[in-house]
Structures are given as C-alpha cells and as structure tokens.
C-alpha cells in the first residue's frame, strides 16, 4: 500500500502483483518513481483500480476508475470491510494477536452493505 510518502511493498513486488488499488492517490504525480515500477506491473499483466473523485493522471491508466462522490470514500471502505468479513477472508489469528476492538469495529461496519455504498457513492 502506498500513501503519504511511503509504502509497504518493494518496487520489485509492485512489478509482480496481479492487482493494484490506488485509493485517493495520484501516484503518477506524487510518487513518480513508484509509478514507474507500477507501470512495469501493468505491462506484466496487473489490473489497476483507481478510487478517487478526480480523474487524475494516474487513474487514466486504471482498468477501472471508481469516481466516488467527494466525502463518500469511508462508506465505500466500510462496505468493502463488511464484505471481507462476511466472506470469511479475515485473518482471525492476526486480529487476535495484533489488534484491539475488532468486535466493535466489525459491528460498526455491519450496516454498510454494498447496496448502501453504491447508492451514496
């Protein structure tokens, strides 16, 4: 994940991923070196999804651009989290070992269905 000036993946890993999710990031302008490696990943077959109300220069390279309404990205994030939980894709061992308040978080996203997020975003 790349965001405010840093990331959790190496440039080499970005070149070898299957999917790239840019959420609120115009990496092409803000992180040009990272974007150079991202482009190698796209050339290697990665699919890119861009989530941003703006049609940025980065989003023009995306396979899918989700142009959410300004201020609705939290609803989208909560709906995605709810789907991950409902699909059983949560790493329960990691959560038990490394987090606090998960049950409260899980309850807080329960009302954010995909239908709700689609309607407001």
Task: Tell me what each language-model feature is.
Residues 1-121:
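Cofactor-pocket helix-loop regions in the catalytic cores of large enzyme subunits
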């Amino acid at each position: 994940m790349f965001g405010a000036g840093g990331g959790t993946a190496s440039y080499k890993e970005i070149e070898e991923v299957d999917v790239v999710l840019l959420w609120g990031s115009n990496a092409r302008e803000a992180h040009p070196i990272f974007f150079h490696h991202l482009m190698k990943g796209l050339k290697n077959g990665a699919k890119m999804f861009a989530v941003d109300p703006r049609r940025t220069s980065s989003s023009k390279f995306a396979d899918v651009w989700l142009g959410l309404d300004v201020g609705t990205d939290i609803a989208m994030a909560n709906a995605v989290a709810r789907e991950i939980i409902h699909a059983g894709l949560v790493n329960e061992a990691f959560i038990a070992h490394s987090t606090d308040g998960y049950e409260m978080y899980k309850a807080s996203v329960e009302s954010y269905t995909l239908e709700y997020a689609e309607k407001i975003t």
